[in-house]
């Protein structure tokens, strides 16, 4: 989570596209392939379903901090984001959890099938082993509300710079249907999962309104 947290911080503190691209390229250069796959999934709308309601997490946070509800709500009103509010109110971590980004995401996927007691124990343990920024990201991921000001185009351009593959080809590859548990990072970039079904052709040009009357265009028979 540390490296992913650093990436998110890097892209949030700048409004320069080139700086955002550089941060992504650095991440793609050093992160494990599974982490890269999860990053692409998250940024292209393939987030796992929320395993825990936000109201339940808020209650756990108030229990840990012994903060009354009115004070929590005042804090929430000031901060403006529930995940960040909880991350700031929780006490300092008592230990450090060494897990990759993909391991955290796999935990979140599997959490859906856990009991309420297991979910609470997991979240409390995670909170006690993460720094404030890492907690904030964890809260957003587990709450299903992770959003970062990075467009798909920026992500694709970063992948193009990292891989040397054309941006248009990459856009086609990562936006389509793919299963991160059934594909490698390299195979995804190469588009090996794409089924080029002739019955579902991709548009090859934009449609524009005719500038002339139909009669002025000549006979339909002359069009190929």
Where are these regions (language model features)?
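N-terminal nucleic-acid-engaging modules of covalent nucleotidyltransferase systems
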Residues: 1-224
